[in-house]
Amino acid sequence: MAKYEILYIIRPNIEEEAKNALVARFDSILSDNGATVVESKDWEKRRLAYEIQDFTEGLYHIVNVEAEDAVALNEFDRLSKINGDILRHMIVKVD
């Protein structure tokens, strides 16, 4: 199984309940498509290097995942591009 790290930035003005629901939804997208979520945690609220959609700060969230193939990662990638609460995301394969 390959190991991946996903980092995504959530808009800073989101309510706590909505943020928790968003994180749970995207964790379930990964697990429903065959990946195993090893760890999913909030990192911190950080200042962005440049404005993204008029925001200068963002809530960083890190997810460590194990997956056999790229199906779950592709679905995560597709849906995170559509979602307005996620400002940016990055998927990296861990050696």
From Swiss-Prot:
Pfam families with a match to the protein in the record: Ribosomal_S6
Keywords in alphabetical order: Ribonucleoprotein, Ribosomal protein, RNA-binding, rRNA-binding
GO biological process: translation
InterPro entries associated with the record: Ribosomal_bS6 (IPR000529), Ribosomal_bS6_sf (IPR035980), Ribosomal_S6_plastid/chlpt (IPR020814), Transl_elong_EF1B/ribsomal_bS6 (IPR014717)
Keyword Ribonucleoprotein: yes
GO cellular component, one term: ribonucleoprotein complex
A GO MF term: structural constituent of ribosome
PANTHER family: MITOCHONDRIAL 28S RIBOSOMAL PROTEIN S6, SMALL RIBOSOMAL SUBUNIT PROTEIN BS6M
Function: Binds together with bS18 to 16S ribosomal RNA.
Family the UniProt entry places it in: Belongs to the bacterial ribosomal protein bS6 family.
Protein name from the UniProt record: Small ribosomal subunit protein bS6
